[in-house]
Amino acid sequence: MKKKNALVFLLGPITPTGRFGMSPVWELVSNLRQFFTAEAALINEGVAVVNPANDIFALLIGQDRFSEKMAKEKSLDKLSHCDVALALPGWERSEGAKTEKEKADELKIPVFYNLTLLLESLKVDDMMDDISENENEK
């Protein structure tokens, strides 16, 4: 998979759980920050990203006929079109993220747990593709 063509799905906690004594609003902000920080880092490296946290804004603005259940279904559909997934810290405490991880495994989509390792893997894939292209040109 070439880096510039790879589509990365972000999975992690979005919905506040109240498990850490944080206010639900602060926990939501913290969770969203994690998604948008990862998205920005990937985009800065030229990687295309599917960020399900973007769908939360439709819920926040009260868009008619858009529910949390629909957002989760939409995420699973988007995941099926991705090449790789990045599990953000705390993913294992989110029922939605665990479902996305199971779906990624079912679809044989590689799941990374570290942004740096994901980027390194994509760069290695780019180099191998370039070597292969050069060999084919000979």
Residue ranges, per PLM feature:
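Conserved catalytic or regulatory cores that recognize and/or transform ribose-phosphate-containing ligands
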Residues: 1-138
